[in-house]
Every structure is written in C-alpha cells, then in structure tokens.
C-alpha cells in the first residue's frame, strides 16, 4: 500500500530500510488498515475526528466514523444541539421495515433512516437478517464481526431515548 503512495518520492528500499532502523515511523492506523480497507475509504487512516451535534445526520456520521476505527469527539453545546429538530409528542409504530445491509455503510444508513422516521413520529421495525453472525471473519477490514446484537441494542436505545424525550429536543 505505502509503496503505491510514495512512488517517485522515496525509493522503496530506502523507505523500508528507514522503517526497519526506526528512523521513521509510519502511521500505525495506516499500517493496520493498509490495503483494500484504506483504499476504499481513508477514514480508517485517522486516529480521531470532531463534529458538532447540530443536525440529525451527526449521529449516523459519527457511527460510520467509529465503525471505521476512528475516534469521534463531539460538542453538544447549546448553540449546536438547539439546531436539532423537536421530537414529536407522539411516536407511533408503523409498518415500515428498515432493511439493514451488512456493511459499515449499511449500518450507518439504517441508523439515519431510523432517526429520520423517529423525527417524523414513526417507530419502524428493522430487519438485520443480512448481517453476518458474530465471529464471522471481516474480509476487507480484518477482524471478526460483532453480529447484529450491538446494532439492535443501539436501535432500541435510540427509540427509547426518543420516547423519553418526546415533545422536546434532545439535549
């Protein structure tokens, strides 16, 4: 991975020698995720990020960044969270089913859809049947899958938080 990125800047043998002698130290995040994961999305190459929570999209964007292995700092100061919409007084179950895809993008997109429905006063259900089981190998990023349980827990927590705060803003 690194050899592709440094072409023309430093001869590869010289770069390898400098790393071996500990004269330079590449980013451990970049080394850990080098290859298809980092080529697909460079978010995995960052140690940390920051965002204000001033839009409902902040939640799924933070989730995606975290799923890439990057830390997320956030601000919930009044000038930011006051921009979030009010939660409806009544949240009613609807027949809508959110189909969750088995990817970081799929999980974040499903959270965005859930929060969108909740802000419209709707409580949909979700189908996590496409998510690989806990312990399955992750082909691109490496490691093992958590299975759908953590996402189901997050969705239930989110619905409960919206119900608890119905008729007002999240704060």
Predicted regions and their residues:
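Extended catalytic cores of very large enzyme megasubunits
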Residues: 1-171
């Amino acid at each position: 991975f690194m050899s592709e990125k440094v072409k023309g800047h430093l001869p590869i043998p010289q770069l390898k020698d400098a790393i071996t002698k500990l004269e330079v130290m590449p980013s451990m995040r970049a080394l850990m995720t080098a290859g298809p994961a980092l080529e697909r999305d460079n978010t995995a190459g960052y140690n940390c990020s920051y965002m204000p929570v001033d839009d409902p999209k902040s939640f799924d964007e933070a989730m995606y960044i975290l799923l890439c292995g990057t830390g997320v700092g956030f601000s919930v100061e009044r000038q930011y969270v006051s921009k979030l919409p009010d939660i409806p007084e009544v949240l009613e179950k609807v027949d809508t089913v959110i189909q969750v895809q088995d990817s970081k993008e799929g999980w974040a997109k499903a959270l965005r859809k859930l929060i969108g429905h909740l802000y419209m006063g709707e409580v949909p259900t979700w189908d996590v049947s496409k998510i690989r089981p806990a312990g399955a190998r992750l082909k691109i990023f490496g490691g093992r899958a958590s299975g759908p349980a953590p996402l189901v827990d997050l969705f239930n927590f989110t619905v409960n938080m919206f119900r608890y705060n119905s008729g007002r803003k999240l704060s």
